[in-house]
Each structure stands twice: as C-alpha cells, then as structure tokens.
C-alpha cells in the first residue's frame, strides 16, 4: 500500500528494487538502446563543430555508457548515479558536469526532458532547452521549450546560450 513516505536510498529494500529496475533497463538497452528521434543527429552535429558534450543522469554508469556508445561516443563527460553527486533537481549533478568539462555555467546549454533536470541545470544558471511542449513549465528567461529533439538545431542551442 502507498504510504506517501519517501523511500530511503540507504534502505536495502529500496536498493534491491532500484537494482532490479536497473538490471531490466540494462537488458533492454544492451543490443540497441532506444534513442529519441533526433538524438543521434544533434549529438553528431555538435561533435562535428567541436562542442564538448556531457550526459547527466541518475541511471547507473553501465546503462549511461551503453546509451553514450549508441550516440557515437561523443561525450567528454558522464555524470551518473554511481558518482554520488545527488539527484536532480539538486544542482550538484550539473555543477559536477560543468566542472569536469572545465567550463563556466554561462558557457553551457542543457537539453533536458524532465522538469527536475531543468531545475537542476537552472540552479547553476545554465540555460536550458526543455523537451516537451505539452508539459507545464514556469516562466523563466533561461528556459526554451521545444516539442521534441527533432526540433533542436545547433543554431537553437547557440541562441539559447545567448
């Protein structure tokens, strides 16, 4: 029964459930991770013009590495749930990525598909291109909302960074 209580990550039962889910996800992405339409195109285009890219995810590193590989291994930095830097919307995951990229937040643009991820990036002053025009997002001059990844171009990312 649902209690409304937040599970503790220190609880062995919570860890067991998380590991079971991670195992199922890993099995499903092993052969060919399902990529959102436009993901490979945009990561390839950014790589071709020499822009550093990072993935920031709460997923285990082994899963993130498989997705990164499917996207062409163009990512300089992977920040994963295994890094112990907290979870979105905490700003620390994106702060860690910016630090590892040796950049400043104002020099970065984040593409996010979740409101908690957008909040994490915005907590560092990073501009965000948010996927999902049908969702509700607070008015924020640092947030651009597009319907899907296919709508993103390198020019949009440069404009969003302004």
Indicate residue ranges for each PLM-predicted region.
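Glycine- and other small-residue-rich loops at beta-strand/loop junctions that grip anionic moieties
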Residues: 31, 56, 86
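Asp-based, Mg2+/Mn2+-dependent phosphohydrolase catalytic module
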Residues: 44-47, 51, 60-162
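Metal-dependent phosphoesterase signature
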Residues: 2-41, 49
């Amino acid at each position: 029964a649902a209690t409304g209580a937040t599970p503790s990550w220190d609880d062995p039962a919570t860890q067991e459930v998380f590991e079971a889910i991670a195992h199922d996800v890993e099995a499903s992405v092993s052969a060919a991770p399902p990529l959102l339409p436009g993901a490979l195109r945009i990561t390839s285009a950014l790589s071709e013009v020499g822009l550093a890219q990072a993935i920031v995810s709460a997923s285990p590193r082994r899963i993130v590495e498989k997705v990164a590989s499917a996207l062409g291994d163009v990512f300089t930095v992977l920040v994963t749930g295994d890094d112990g830097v907290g979870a979105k919307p905490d700003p620390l995951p994106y702060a860690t990525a910016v630090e590892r990229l040796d950049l400043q937040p104002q020099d970065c643009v984040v593409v996010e598909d979740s409101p908690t991820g957008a909040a994490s990036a915005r907590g560092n002053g990073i501009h965000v291109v948010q996927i999902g025009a049908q969702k509700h997002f607070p008015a924020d001059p640092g947030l651009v909302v597009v319907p899907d990844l296919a709508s993103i171009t390198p020019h949009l990312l440069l404009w969003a960074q302004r």
